[in-house]
């Protein structure tokens, strides 16, 4: 009985498939639900018929309702983090910081005006023994004029009479000199402290003049003749102290309130850049300077501007009897004018 039913159902299905292929009609599906107990569904589904379509639709609807009831809700999708767009949001531009206002600079307090230096009044001479006056040491030359003065420093040869001595010390104390008794060189053959030559220089009518002065405690051709104190000097005239090799143009030694002049000096009266002079008295005439070929001695040179203030005041204020300071403020320029050799 079962076998016959199975054969009948199979034939009916085959007829239905052939009819579908012949008519090329709408695919119809066969409901295999009643045959599941006897056979298994074919691997390839046949096109459903109208009736099977309705049945499957009903079945599908029922299944969909069941699936909706048991369907697991889809997980909520976590949105990916949004990458910030650097162009979208711009950092706020900070407001410019105003430059600090500088504190007002106070006006400089003017330096107090120093009280005027009171006039010291006339110089009061401070005499000390002629052999107690300490000379100034020769400073290192710095200026052009100082260097030229050292370079052309003369040498003096003592024929007779006193040797040169310092005239003033740093404190302004001055030599008391010597009386005119005894031999011309008695008591004045040289200081134990050393000797000194004084210098001062300037331009005169386009020529550079350097005056060198010596002090002697007395000028005495013989005992009782002459006078206390003596000053003698020589002026060396050069073309320009500021060139490499200045030229000696003339030499004017002092002689009895006047000058002897050599323009230019004799070759044998110059030793390199040092002119040579002699100190001599031809009896009964007092001492004077003159050019010579004989070599002499050098002394430490101190220029006018290198003297202490008190020493300059003393040189300007002290009276030396019949002698006078040739390089002080009152005598320097007049003597240069008088000695002009050209």
From Swiss-Prot:
Residues 93-121 have a biased composition (Pro residues). It holds the Pfam family NPP1. It is found in: Secreted. Residues 41-125 are annotated as: Disordered. One of its GO terms (cellular component) is extracellular region. Keywords: Glycoprotein, Secreted, Signal, Virulence. Induction: Differentially expressed during the developmental and plant infection phases. Glycans are attached at residue 24. Belongs to the Necrosis inducing protein (NPP1) family. Secreted effector that contributes strongly to virulence during infection by P.capsici. Induces cell death in the Solanaceae, including Nicotiana benthamiana. PANTHER family: DOMAIN PROTEIN, PUTATIVE (AFU_ORTHOLOGUE AFUA_5G00600)-RELATED. Key residues/motif important for the effector activities are degenerated in most NLPs, including the nlp24 peptide consisting of the conserved region I (11-aa immunogenic part) and conserved region II (the heptapeptide GHRHDWE motif) that is important for phytotoxic activity. This is NLP effector protein Pc107869. It comes from Phytophthora capsici.
């Amino acid at each position: 009985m079962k076998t016959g039913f199975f054969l009948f159902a199979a034939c009916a299905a085959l007829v239905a498939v052939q009819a579908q292929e012949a008519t090329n009609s709408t695919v119809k599906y066969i409901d295999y639900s009643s045959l599941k107990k006897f056979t298994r569904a074919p691997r390839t589904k046949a096109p459903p018929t109208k009736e099977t379509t309705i049945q499957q639709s009903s079945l599908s609807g029922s299944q969909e309702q069941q699936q909706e009831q048991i369907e697991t809700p889809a997980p909520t999708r976590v949105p990916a983090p949004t990458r910030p767009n650097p162009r979208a949001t711009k950092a706020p531009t900070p407001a410019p910081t105003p430059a600090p206002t500088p504190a007002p600079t106070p006006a400089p307090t003017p330096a107090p005006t120093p009280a005027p230096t009171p006039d010291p009044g006339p110089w009061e001479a401070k005499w000390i023994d002629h052999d107690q006056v300490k000379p100034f040491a020769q400073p290192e030359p710095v200026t052009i004029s100082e260097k030229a003065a050292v370079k052309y420093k003369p040498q003096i040869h003592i024929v007779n009479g006193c040797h040169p001595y310092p005239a003033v010390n740093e404190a302004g104390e001055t030599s008391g000199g010597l009386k005119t008794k005894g031999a011309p060189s008695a008591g004045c053959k040289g200081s134990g402290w050393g000797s000194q030559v004084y210098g001062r220089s300037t331009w005169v009518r386009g020529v550079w003049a350097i005056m060198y002065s010596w002090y002697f405690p007395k000028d005495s051709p013989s005992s009782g003749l002459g006078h206390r104190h003596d000053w003698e000097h020589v002026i060396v005239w050069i073309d320009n102290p500021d060139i490499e090799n200045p030229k000696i143009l003339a030499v004017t030694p002092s002689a009895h309130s006047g000058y002897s002049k050599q323009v230019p000096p004799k070759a044998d009266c110059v030793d390199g850049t040092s002119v040579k002079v002699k100190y001599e008295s031809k009896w009964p005439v007092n001492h004077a300077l003159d050019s010579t070929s004989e070599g002499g001695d050098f002394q430490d040179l101190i220029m006018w501007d290198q003297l202490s203030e008190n020493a300059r005041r003393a040189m300007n204020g002290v009276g030396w009897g019949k002698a006078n300071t040739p390089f002080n403020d009152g005598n320097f320029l007049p003597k240069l004018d008088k000695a002009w050799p050209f």
